[in-house]
Amino acid sequence: MEIVYDRGGLIPVVVQDAQSQAVLMLAYMNRAALQLTLQTGEAHFWSRSRQQLWHKGATSGNTQQVVDLQLDCDGDALLMRVNPAGPACHTGRTSCFHNPIDPIDWQGENHDPR
């Protein structure tokens, strides 16, 4: 199956802990990041804010050793299972997903929960 990148040349990557199955983060890869990930066995992404390649954990030491990569049924998203060497989130939390949304307080798609 062929990888389908978006107009900006990116593909979303859901990163999951291979042991606990917890979803750790959502990031994006371009072709170069995917190539580096496959070559090194460690997670590399494209930073949309900095507009540069990003080796996860290069400065913090919280690298992610890749166990496997799976392409979704449409070819436009990746699941990357990893063995993390530390927290995935820049806040120091294990996962970037730690902000629950209360459905009772949700007012619709234009509601800003801040």
Could you say what each language-model-derived stretch is?
Residues 2-10, 16-24, 29-114:
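C-terminal binding/interaction regions
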